[in-house]
């Protein structure tokens, strides 16, 4: 069971799809991530304010994005290839009354393009729509007995003007995905000077740092490797 650890929505249960295809971060690892992001140079909640833009790649339930929003981040963009997981995440956003602070893009993160205006989540008509109000019909999460009735409301998510303060990358393990995602983020200028990148990967996976990336923290947790990085346009 996933819960929000701290902030405005503390102890809220984050619903997840049954028979999920993704691997959600463990509670221990999630606590470790946010302990790092709220201590040391980040003490005083510097990363989480009304202007903070979050990008959650391979978002699944959106646990990391929702935790960030609970702690004060202003806006989050969740990207995942699994339609049903995003639909449930959108319903959860609406239940928290933060549907206007979240975009959902239903696409393989490796195929994301800067020049595209996405209509996030797919409907049966194979159209892309966005935000928590976008979904048609009812999504019911059995374990929490939460029912979401979501009307259609189309809104675009324009990735061409997006720049993010904090990026979460939590892809399937052992797929050599992280290097490809990092190249995509840098190529499309979605990172700015000082952007923090949090990567969860298998301890056996490797990532050769780009010249513009510095390590803030690197640690092993069981079979997982956690990297907290900073992008700097000044590094050469």
Swiss-Prot record:
Enzyme Commission number(s) from the entry: 2.1.1.-
This protein's UniProt keywords: Methyltransferase, Transferase
Cited Gene3D superfamilies: Vaccinia Virus protein VP39 (3.40.50.150)
Domain of life where this protein originates: Bacteria
Matching Pfam families: Cons_hypoth95 (PF03602)
SUPFAM superfamilies: S-adenosyl-L-methionine-dependent methyltransferases
GO biological process, one term: rRNA methylation
InterPro entries named among the record's database cross-references: DNA_methylase_N6_adenine_CS, RNA_MeTrfase_RsmD, RPE1, SAM-dependent_MTases_sf
Protein name: Uncharacterized methylase RP545
Protein source organism: Rickettsia prowazekii (strain Madrid E)
């Amino acid at each position: 069971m996933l819960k929000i650890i701290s902030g405005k929505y503390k102890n809220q249960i984050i619903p997840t799809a049954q028979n999920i295809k993704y691997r959600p971060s463990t509670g221990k690892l999630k606590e470790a991530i946010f302990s790092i992001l709220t201590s040391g140079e980040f003490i005083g909640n510097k990363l989480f304010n009304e202007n903070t833009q979050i990008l959650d790649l391979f978002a699944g339930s959106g646990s990391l994005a929702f935790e960030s929003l609970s702690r004060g981040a202003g806006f989050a963009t969740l990207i995942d290839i699994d339609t049903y997981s995003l639909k449930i995440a959108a319903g959860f956003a609406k239940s928290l009354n933060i549907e206007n602070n979240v975009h959902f893009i239903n696409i393989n993160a490796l195929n994301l393009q800067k020049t595209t205006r996405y209509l996030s989540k797919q409907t049966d008509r194979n159209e892309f729509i966005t935000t928590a109000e976008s979904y048609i019909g009812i999504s019911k999460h059995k374990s929490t007995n939460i029912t979401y009735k979501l009307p259609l409301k189309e809104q675009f998510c324009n990735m061409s003007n997006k720049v993010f303060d904090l990026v979460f990358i939590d892809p399937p393990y052992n797929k050599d995905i992280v290097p490809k995602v990092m190249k995509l983020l840098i190529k499309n200028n979605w990172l700015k000077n000082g952007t923090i990148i949090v990567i969860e990967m298998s301890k056996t996976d490797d990532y050769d740092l780009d010249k513009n990336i510095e390590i803030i923290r690197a640690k092993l947790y069981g079979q997982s490797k956690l990297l907290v990085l900073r992008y700097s346009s000044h590094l050469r």
